[in-house]
Amino acid sequence: MRNNIYTLLLLFLFTSVNAQEYSKLISEADKLYETKNYKMSTDLYNKAFKIESKNPNHLYNGACASSLAGNTKKAFKWLNLSIEKGWTNLKHLNSDTDLENLHSKKEWGKTIEKLEKKLELIEANYDKPLQAELLTILDEDQKYRVQINETQKKFAQDSKEMQDLWKITIQKDSINLLKVKKILDEKGWVGKDKVGAQANSALFLVIQHSDLETQKKYLPMMKEAVTKGNASPGSLALLIDRIEIREGRKQIYGSQIGTNPNTKTQYVLPLIDPDNVDKRRTEVGLGPISDYVKNWNLIWDVEKYKSELSELEKLNK
């Protein structure tokens, strides 16, 4: 029995080390892609996929990097594997400029046909009208926020340009919320098996962008949906964090970012037990907080964060 336990412990440690190495390689490959070093990016994706090749998004990103590096053979290999592992966004696949140099290859038509046939099987039992409605809602929810992200690079937060965009966004959000509440009240939290992953994500995004009372009302429904596989645990974590912060408590997963009114710099809003945040994030399928905060050009230093936490809590009152 002791030998079995020892073997299991070694297996656990080996798996943990491999998982950490995989995440590190993927993160570095992503950085190299962003700096247009596509060959080095491809090399690191290749090393990562020798450890594990199950994540369809990572495989797709690897295909993009290898395509841009001119390695079409590897690009098709990873692209087809991503489809086998669950990549289903045909619209994005057809429009992705990273893959343009694959279009002239005979394998391209076969790859598109492969995904189309897979989608036919997957979508055979879809609620097509509901899917179309949710995809429209998703587009309305995201397109103005994309514009906001682009505009704030050029104009101040209190500029007329930003104020006008936020006014439109708030109006669209209120319309979308009425539609989503009707869907949730009549049909429940509809899973991706009925409308597809993209359309399913619209439910979360609209609730995430709604008022506190609405968020609290639909939180139990989303929790139940997660247990049934109809909603993402990571998305639920983001909703929980937002509610916790809005109600004056510390967040759990570190997903909510605030702006210091004095320095105008951004920071991770008050967080419980910062030392173990990555453990909690891993449990719900979220990546390391050090990678997450880079989206706001922040560097995660847990000791520095803990030393500043009492002051950050004052800012949030």
Where is each model-derived feature located?
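Start-of-helix register in tetratricopeptide repeats
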Residues: 23, 57, 91-92
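Preference for long, solvent-exposed alpha-helical segments and helix-linker "stalks"
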Residues: 84-202, 209-213, 240
